[in-house]
């Protein structure tokens, strides 16, 4: 039996340039949670390094919450609340780079779905509404324009920390209806009447600002 690869798939093994960086191939390990994160960083680092060793061209963290108001305890993820989180994230980057892969980080704030059981902060979102992911009587607070400016500042600071840790890529995440950008995008959770609500252009405004500032 021949072990020769079907030439139709050769492109998957070719380098690809993404902005200023080049991945060694087209195999991208998407962000996924694994129950390790900040609670078991050594295991998380070893697992991500193993993926790079196995041939993945880009290895990405699970979602990484970047501010105490986005605390999703009791779920275990990575976090980048302050400089104290940099050492274990930088060690993950080193483990990935050791095998020639790019390291990515997915920055996430769960907004109105943040229970904040550890941080004890008040969750934030486009409008006042109950937190839906937890069996606790928690109410999210509507973000003022000042809150939105703060949120953008927190995100920029997290991007700079990610850069300091050595990450090659940042995922500005707005998926699965569980993040601040996705809450602003949805008519169901965003019924604001200012420049961040109403039309699709307005509901996209925060996401565009985050991308441009990243």
Q: What does each model-found stretch correspond to?
A:
Residues 2-28, 96:
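N-terminal amphipathic alpha-helix/helix-capping segment at the start of soluble metabolic enzymes
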Residues 27-30, 59-61, 103-107, 170-172:
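Hydrophobic faces of well-ordered beta-strands that scaffold small-molecule active sites
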Residues 30-43, 75-81, 112-116, 136-157, ...:
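Active-site mouth loops of central-metabolism enzymes
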Residues 45-67, 164-170:
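Catalytic domains of carbohydrate-active enzymes, especially glycoside hydrolases
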Residues 66-74, 79-80, 116-143, 181-204:
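Aromatic- and acidic-residue-enriched carbohydrate-binding clefts of CAZyme catalytic domains
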Residues 76-104, 186-214:
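Alpha-helix-loop-beta-strand connector modules within alpha/beta enzyme cores
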Residues 94, 102, 108-167:
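Non-globular sequence segments
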């Amino acid at each position: 039996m021949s072990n020769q690869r079907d030439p139709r798939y050769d492109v998957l093994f070719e380098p690809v340039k993404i902005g200023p960086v080049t991945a060694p191939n087209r195999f991208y390990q998407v962000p996924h949670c694994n129950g390790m994160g900040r609670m078991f960083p050594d295991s998380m680092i070893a697992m991500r390094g193993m993926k790079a060793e196995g041939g993945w061209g880009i290895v990405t963290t699970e979602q990484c919450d970047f501010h105490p108001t986005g605390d999703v305890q009791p779920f275990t993820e990575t976090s980048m609340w302050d400089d104290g989180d940099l050492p274990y994230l930088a060690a993950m980057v080193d483990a990935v780079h050791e095998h020639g892969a790019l390291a990515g980080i997915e920055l996430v704030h769960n907004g109105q779905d943040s229970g904040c059981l550890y941080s004890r902060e008040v969750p934030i979102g486009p409008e006042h509404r109950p937190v839906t992911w937890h069996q606790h009587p928690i109410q999210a607070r509507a973000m003022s324009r000042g809150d939105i400016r703060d949120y953008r500042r927190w995100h920029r600071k997290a991007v700079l920390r990610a850069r300091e840790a050595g990450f090659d890529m940042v995922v500005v995440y707005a998926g699965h209806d569980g993040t601040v950008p996705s809450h602003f995008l949805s008519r169901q959770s965003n019924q604001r009447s200012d420049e961040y609500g109403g039309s699709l252009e307005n509901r996209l405004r925060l996401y565009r600002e985050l991308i441009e500032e990243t």
